[in-house]
């Protein structure tokens, strides 16, 4: 099985981190092809970045026609509908994957994301997926996406602080990491706080493996039809 994991921004260091997270959970016989867009924004933070990254994302998908599934490694689920229309293999965004994983193991969950301007888009997605009632809050750390690549201890401190606030005030039962740039923190944070911490990259790879194993592909009747 070959899974294409696409980072829709152009920051290769984030793609490297995403690749490590994907390969850590993939089956031994699964090949992970990790790549990023060649054109577009360096990070995706809010509605404008979401819109401007889609042409580069679609171009990158077209460069990899021989894959069995696609994971779009942006927590906004950028371009998922467009890519599902373009291809027939299963396509999953890491936001949708993480929300569903959290809903399966906890009665309620919170999302820890980057900038405040990203919050409305994530809340819109939760409503669209029918999971808004299970998410008690989407919390912003006000950390720019690219700051996650610097390894600054202050960045990790802010993420941990929001998790503590969520546990105390939101009474959350699980934490969803709301950015692919946080993928490397899942195990560390889960162990420290003693509750499930979900990374969408890991969840996305695991879910698309299951879809391929069950011989399920994107429906071409209705919304994702090109006819």
Which stretches of residues belong to each language-model region?
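Short, flexible loop segments at boundaries between secondary-structure elements
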Residues: 198-217
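Short, structured coil segments at secondary-structure junctions
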Residues: 28, 86-89, 105, 134, ...
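N-terminal beta1-alpha1 ligand-phosphate binding loop
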Residues: 3-25
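N-terminal beta-loop-helix "entrance" segment that forms/cooperates
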Residues: 33-59, 146-151
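Periplasmic-binding protein-like
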Residues: 5-6, 68-74, 171-179
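Active-site rim beta-loop-alpha module in soluble metabolic enzymes
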Residues: 117-178
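Glycine/small-residue-rich loop that forms an oxyanion/phosphate-binding "nest" at active or ligand-binding sites
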Residues: 54-107, 111
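Short, well-structured alpha-helical segments in soluble
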Residues: 51-66, 157-171
């Amino acid at each position: 099985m070959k899974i294409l994991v696409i980072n829709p921004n152009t920051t290769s260091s984030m793609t490297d981190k995403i690749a490590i997270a994907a390969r850590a959970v993939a089956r031994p016989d699964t090949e992970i092809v990790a790549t990023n867009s060649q054109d577009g924004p360096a990070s995706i933070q809010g509605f404008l970045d979401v819109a401007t990254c889609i042409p580069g994302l679609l171009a990158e998908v077209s460069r990899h026609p021989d894959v069995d599934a696609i994971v779009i490694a942006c927590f906004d689920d950028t371009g998922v509908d467009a890519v599902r229309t373009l291809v027939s293999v299963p396509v999953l965004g890491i936001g949708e994957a993480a929300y569903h994983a959290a809903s399966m193991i906890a009665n309620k969950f919170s999302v820890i994301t980057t900038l405040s301007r990203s919050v409305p888009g994530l809340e819109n997605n939760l409503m669209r997926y029918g999971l808004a009632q299970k998410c008690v809050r989407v919390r912003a750390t006000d950390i720019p996406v690219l700051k996650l690549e610097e390894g600054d201890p202050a960045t990790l401190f802010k993420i941990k602080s929001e998790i503590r606030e969520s546990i105390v005030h939101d009474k959350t039962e699980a934490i969803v990491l709301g950015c692919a740039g946080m993928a490397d923190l899942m195990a560390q944070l889960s162990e420290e706080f003693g509750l499930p911490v979900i990374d969408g990259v890991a969840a996305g790879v695991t879910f698309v493996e299951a879809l391929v194993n069950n011989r399920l592909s994107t429906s071409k009747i209705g919304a994702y039809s090109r006819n």
